[in-house]
Protein backbone atom coordinates (compact mmCIF):
# COMPACT_ATOMS: atom_id res chain seq x y z
CA UNK A 1 0.00 0.00 0.00
CA UNK A 2 0.96 3.67 -0.24
CA UNK A 3 1.18 3.91 3.56
CA UNK A 4 3.58 0.96 3.69
CA UNK A 5 5.77 2.50 1.01
CA UNK A 6 5.93 5.74 2.99
CA UNK A 7 6.85 3.96 6.22
CA UNK A 8 9.48 1.49 5.03
CA UNK A 9 12.76 3.22 4.24
CA UNK A 10 16.16 1.94 3.20
CA UNK A 11 19.50 2.75 4.78
CA UNK A 12 23.15 2.00 4.16
CA UNK A 13 25.43 1.19 7.10
CA UNK A 14 29.16 1.48 6.35
CA UNK A 15 31.61 -0.15 8.76
CA UNK A 16 35.35 -0.75 8.46
CA UNK A 17 35.78 -4.53 8.49
CA UNK A 18 33.94 -7.24 6.51
CA UNK A 19 33.69 -9.29 9.72
CA UNK A 20 31.83 -6.49 11.49
CA UNK A 21 29.56 -5.97 8.46
CA UNK A 22 28.56 -9.63 8.56
CA UNK A 23 28.03 -9.60 12.34
CA UNK A 24 25.80 -6.52 12.20
CA UNK A 25 23.72 -7.92 9.34
CA UNK A 26 23.06 -11.14 11.28
CA UNK A 27 21.77 -9.19 14.32
CA UNK A 28 18.43 -8.89 12.53
CA UNK A 29 18.07 -12.36 11.03
CA UNK A 30 19.58 -14.13 8.05
CA UNK A 31 20.46 -11.42 5.52
CA UNK A 32 20.33 -11.59 1.76
CA UNK A 33 23.65 -11.08 0.00
CA UNK A 34 24.69 -9.53 -3.24
CA UNK A 35 28.14 -9.15 -4.72
CA UNK A 36 29.22 -5.96 -6.47
CA UNK A 37 32.73 -6.05 -7.98
CA UNK A 38 33.91 -8.62 -5.40
CA UNK A 39 32.39 -6.66 -2.48
CA UNK A 40 29.71 -8.33 -0.34
CA UNK A 41 26.66 -6.25 0.51
CA UNK A 42 24.28 -7.61 3.16
CA UNK A 43 20.60 -6.70 3.10
CA UNK A 44 18.29 -7.31 6.06
CA UNK A 45 15.05 -5.88 7.48
CA UNK A 46 15.07 -4.12 10.86
CA UNK A 47 11.74 -2.69 11.92
CA UNK A 48 10.88 0.09 9.49
CA UNK A 49 14.32 0.05 7.84
CA UNK A 50 15.76 -2.12 5.11
CA UNK A 51 19.46 -2.13 6.00
CA UNK A 52 22.28 -2.56 3.51
CA UNK A 53 25.55 -3.26 5.33
CA UNK A 54 28.96 -2.99 3.69
CA UNK A 55 32.62 -2.60 4.72
CA UNK A 56 35.04 0.08 3.55
CA UNK A 57 38.06 -2.07 4.35
CA UNK A 58 39.64 0.63 6.53
CA UNK A 59 41.14 3.83 5.15
CA UNK A 60 40.21 4.79 1.60
CA UNK A 61 42.63 7.69 1.06
CA UNK A 62 46.18 8.47 2.18
CA UNK A 63 48.68 11.24 1.59
CA UNK A 64 50.17 11.25 -1.88
CA UNK A 65 53.90 10.73 -2.26
CA UNK A 66 54.11 13.09 -5.22
CA UNK A 67 54.36 16.87 -4.95
CA UNK A 68 55.01 19.13 -2.01
CA UNK A 69 56.97 17.88 1.00
CA UNK A 70 56.00 14.20 1.17
CA UNK A 71 52.45 14.95 0.08
CA UNK A 72 51.92 18.27 1.87
CA UNK A 73 51.85 21.57 -0.03
CA UNK A 74 52.87 24.86 1.60
CA UNK A 75 50.93 27.97 0.61
CA UNK A 76 52.33 30.98 2.48
CA UNK A 77 51.43 30.18 6.11
CA UNK A 78 49.15 27.24 5.32
CA UNK A 79 49.95 23.54 4.93
CA UNK A 80 47.66 21.62 2.57
CA UNK A 81 47.70 17.80 2.74
CA UNK A 82 47.00 16.17 -0.63
CA UNK A 83 45.23 12.81 -0.53
CA UNK A 84 44.84 10.08 -3.13
CA UNK A 85 43.38 6.58 -3.26
CA UNK A 86 45.16 3.75 -1.45
CA UNK A 87 46.34 0.79 -3.51
CA UNK A 88 47.22 -2.73 -2.44
CA UNK A 89 49.23 -5.40 -4.21
CA UNK A 90 47.16 -8.55 -4.66
CA UNK A 91 50.35 -10.65 -4.72
CA UNK A 92 52.29 -9.56 -1.63
CA UNK A 93 49.80 -7.33 0.20
CA UNK A 94 51.96 -4.19 0.13
CA UNK A 95 49.95 -0.96 0.52
CA UNK A 96 50.98 2.23 -1.27
CA UNK A 97 49.78 5.21 -3.34
CA UNK A 98 50.57 6.83 -6.70
CA UNK A 99 52.08 3.81 -8.46
CA UNK A 100 50.77 1.44 -11.10
CA UNK A 101 53.01 -1.39 -9.93
CA UNK A 102 53.95 -2.75 -6.51
CA UNK A 103 57.12 -1.10 -5.11
CA UNK A 104 58.07 -4.37 -3.37
CA UNK A 105 57.44 -7.21 -5.82
CA UNK A 106 56.83 -5.27 -9.05
CA UNK A 107 53.43 -6.86 -9.68
CA UNK A 108 50.82 -4.92 -11.63
CA UNK A 109 48.03 -6.95 -10.04
CA UNK A 110 46.80 -3.98 -8.00
CA UNK A 111 43.50 -3.26 -6.22
CA UNK A 112 42.63 0.40 -5.76
CA UNK A 113 40.31 1.90 -3.16
CA UNK A 114 38.72 3.74 -6.07
CA UNK A 115 36.61 0.58 -6.31
CA UNK A 116 35.30 1.28 -2.80
CA UNK A 117 34.52 4.88 -3.77
CA UNK A 118 32.45 3.70 -6.74
CA UNK A 119 30.70 1.07 -4.60
CA UNK A 120 29.70 3.59 -1.94
CA UNK A 121 28.48 6.06 -4.54
CA UNK A 122 26.32 3.39 -6.17
CA UNK A 123 24.85 2.16 -2.88
CA UNK A 124 24.20 5.65 -1.54
CA UNK A 125 22.02 6.39 -4.57
CA UNK A 126 19.85 3.36 -3.75
CA UNK A 127 18.94 4.34 -0.16
CA UNK A 128 17.13 7.05 1.77
CA UNK A 129 19.80 7.39 4.45
CA UNK A 130 23.46 6.57 5.09
CA UNK A 131 24.81 5.66 8.52
CA UNK A 132 28.60 5.84 8.93
CA UNK A 133 29.55 3.27 11.58
CA UNK A 134 33.34 3.33 11.50
CA UNK A 135 35.34 2.82 14.71
CA UNK A 136 34.85 5.37 17.54
CA UNK A 137 38.38 6.80 17.51
CA UNK A 138 40.36 9.39 15.54
CA UNK A 139 41.24 6.91 12.78
CA UNK A 140 37.61 5.84 12.48
CA UNK A 141 36.47 9.46 12.45
CA UNK A 142 38.82 10.25 9.54
CA UNK A 143 37.58 7.22 7.62
CA UNK A 144 34.04 8.32 8.43
CA UNK A 145 34.74 11.84 7.19
CA UNK A 146 36.09 10.49 3.91
CA UNK A 147 33.00 8.29 3.50
CA UNK A 148 30.82 11.33 4.22
CA UNK A 149 32.45 13.31 1.41
CA UNK A 150 31.97 10.36 -0.96
CA UNK A 151 28.27 9.71 -0.32
CA UNK A 152 26.92 13.17 0.56
CA UNK A 153 26.45 14.32 -3.08
CA UNK A 154 24.30 11.22 -3.72
CA UNK A 155 22.35 10.93 -0.47
CA UNK A 156 21.52 14.07 1.50
CA UNK A 157 20.69 12.28 4.77
CA UNK A 158 24.02 11.13 6.22
CA UNK A 159 24.72 10.57 9.93
CA UNK A 160 27.37 9.02 12.14
CA UNK A 161 26.78 6.06 14.44
CA UNK A 162 28.94 5.54 17.52
CA UNK A 163 28.99 2.29 19.48
CA UNK A 164 31.73 0.69 21.54
CA UNK A 165 30.67 -2.94 21.42
CA UNK A 166 29.42 -4.99 18.49
CA UNK A 167 26.07 -6.07 19.94
CA UNK A 168 22.50 -5.72 18.77
CA UNK A 169 21.65 -3.59 21.81
CA UNK A 170 24.56 -1.19 21.19
CA UNK A 171 23.68 -0.85 17.51
CA UNK A 172 20.01 -0.15 18.23
CA UNK A 173 21.04 2.53 20.74
CA UNK A 174 23.38 4.11 18.17
CA UNK A 175 20.65 4.08 15.52
CA UNK A 176 18.37 5.91 17.95
CA UNK A 177 21.06 8.49 18.78
CA UNK A 178 23.00 9.31 15.59
CA UNK A 179 25.41 12.23 15.58
CA UNK A 180 27.48 14.29 13.16
CA UNK A 181 31.17 13.88 12.30
CA UNK A 182 33.53 15.17 15.01
CA UNK A 183 35.82 17.42 12.99
CA UNK A 184 38.39 17.93 15.82
CA UNK A 185 39.00 14.15 15.76
CA UNK A 186 39.47 14.29 11.99
CA UNK A 187 41.88 17.21 12.25
CA UNK A 188 43.88 15.42 14.95
CA UNK A 189 44.23 12.35 12.75
CA UNK A 190 45.35 14.45 9.77
CA UNK A 191 48.05 16.17 11.84
CA UNK A 192 49.27 12.84 13.23
CA UNK A 193 49.37 11.33 9.74
CA UNK A 194 51.43 14.27 8.46
CA UNK A 195 53.84 13.80 11.38
CA UNK A 196 54.09 10.10 10.60
CA UNK A 197 54.82 10.83 6.95
CA UNK A 198 57.39 13.56 7.54
CA UNK A 199 59.25 11.81 10.35
CA UNK A 200 59.01 8.34 8.84
CA UNK A 201 60.05 9.28 5.31
CA UNK A 202 62.94 11.48 6.40
CA UNK A 203 64.34 9.03 8.96
CA UNK A 204 63.96 6.14 6.54
CA UNK A 205 65.80 8.08 3.82
CA UNK A 206 68.68 8.73 6.19
CA UNK A 207 68.83 5.05 7.12
CA UNK A 208 68.98 4.14 3.43
CA UNK A 209 71.83 6.60 2.87
CA UNK A 210 73.71 5.38 5.94
CA UNK A 211 73.37 1.60 5.53
CA UNK A 212 72.64 1.32 1.77
CA UNK A 213 69.64 -0.91 2.55
CA UNK A 214 66.39 0.46 1.11
CA UNK A 215 64.18 -1.96 3.07
CA UNK A 216 65.00 -0.26 6.39
CA UNK A 217 62.35 2.06 7.80
CA UNK A 218 61.78 4.27 10.84
CA UNK A 219 58.79 6.15 12.15
CA UNK A 220 57.38 8.63 14.66
CA UNK A 221 56.44 5.94 17.20
CA UNK A 222 59.08 3.21 17.05
CA UNK A 223 62.18 5.41 16.73
CA UNK A 224 61.95 7.05 20.21
CA UNK A 225 61.18 3.63 21.70
CA UNK A 226 64.23 2.05 20.12
CA UNK A 227 66.35 5.07 21.05
Predicted stretch roles:
Residues 1-193, 197, 202, 224:
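Intrinsically disordered, low-complexity regulatory segments
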Residues 204-227:
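Charge-patterned, long linear interaction tracts outside catalytic cores
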Amino acid sequence: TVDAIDIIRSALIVVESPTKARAIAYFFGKPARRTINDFTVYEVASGQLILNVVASGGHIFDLTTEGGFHGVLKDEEEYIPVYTDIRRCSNCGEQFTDREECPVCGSRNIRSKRDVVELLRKLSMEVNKVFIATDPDAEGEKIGYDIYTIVKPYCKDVERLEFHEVTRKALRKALAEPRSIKLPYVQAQVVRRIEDRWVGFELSRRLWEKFKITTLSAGRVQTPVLG
